[in-house]
């Protein structure tokens, strides 16, 4: 056996083992943006001695996804995904008592006798029916609690009811809790709520462990076909890690957790449900199911929930999922009287237009550039990542997570840097990084250098973090996809930009973004800043409203049913609109 030291961990492996397999088997979270294909060059590692691994090199370093172990070695993961990411906002969800979805109910039953030998379940079922509630077949968790639950208080049953459905027996004297979960492609956001008060008892955001199988949903779908159990477990274990930490922190027992609501894009939810999402990746792009799904927690492997149900929100289409439904619910777009646009930018961009009581939605495959993937020095928002950049005439200043030296650049910083480079004449409107003699500032000219035949612009003094011409092109492709989707949706609904009264920027990415920078690169048209608001993770808040309230659940189902999906594929004007959108300006006619 070989001895392999990875950062601070000592592991064993066999000669000929792939380093990527060792990382996965050891539960070490590490990004493989292209899914292990060796094409993105972003999983480079330092190995000592260098001769202990075989495989292709990128900038003189082995790729973790291609490296094969041959001898004892030490491996240093230069950019390792942080296990925990701080969540931006917390807070309660105000729910009227009459609108509360989960409530306590007490039923007094007639005790059994030699003359009345009905089973425990028959006895409870008939009492539920008499109270106007449903009495479906009980699951194993409810049956396990049945005998003690009925006899502990002399046949007075203390129950928890969700609408007209029985969730289980109430933990007497204790609050009952539930989880709202946003299962994202990149991150998983989990919040714990008191179901009676709407109080948020805690929140955690983690990187989705599926990042080891690729940065985008197409990579995940392909990986699911190769190893469906591992890919599904990567998602469920990420959720469980966050949920268990929240329960421990809030000192809440698993028996008190009775309800969980999950939102996510269609491929993420298909995978969580154990359904093959492959048909979502091929025309005509038909999901297996768009309805809400309700299952016992055991079917998801959710050991952090003792009883009750796990529910997913409905989908709108193969490309607009339950996360978008959550955004609609959270922002009240279904009842919006103003003409409003909601935009969730990420690897997959979703756009919703509310106008005249009608909802229309579309999506754009922006790719992973907004998340820092496929960028030379790109990364997620992890320790050492540059999040904000200001390009001044004589200097470049950077804000770094953790406060140390910058080691990488995340999507928000990429947009801000390119916007600043445009303002200072380092990039022209076509996206070309200009020659040094075309830049007016001597300090900025000195930041231009050639790397592998392409011009690059240094963000750090030592040139260790930089933006290349290829990186600028990647950003252009990503923002053009979003912009074209916005324009197409507005054209389809006959809406001019001047009619848009409110723009909502949703998602963790939108929360950290400079709106003026988005306008400068042409992602949004010139817009008064007071018309734009960043709403954070609205999908998670929508999940919380469905978790806690009858009206939230009803609105989610109504929104999914009434929202019209606008398909962009095959439109004759799409390619020309996309080409125009590559420019770093919005142009006329909006």
Regions found by a protein language model. Give the residues of each.
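A short acidic Gly-Thr/Ser loop motif
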Residues: 36-38, 181-187, 193-196, 265, ...
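A short helix-loop
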Residues: 352-355, 380-443, 556-568
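Catalytic phosphate/nucleotide-handling subdomain of diverse soluble enzymes
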Residues: 355, 491, 495-560
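Nucleotide/phosphate-binding catalytic cleft detector across ATP-hydrolyzing
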Residues: 59-180, 185, 231-236, 240-254, ...
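N-terminal phosphate-binding loop and adjacent alpha-helix
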Residues: 209-248, 374, 385-390, 474-477, ...
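Glycine-rich phosphate-binding loop of actin/hexokinase-like ATP-binding domains
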Residues: 184-185, 190-216, 278-292, 326-329, ...
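Local cysteine-cluster metal-coordination motifs and their immediate loop/turn environment
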Residues: 29-50, 56-71
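A contiguous, well-structured pocket-lining segment that forms one wall/lid of small-molecule binding clefts
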Residues: 422-493
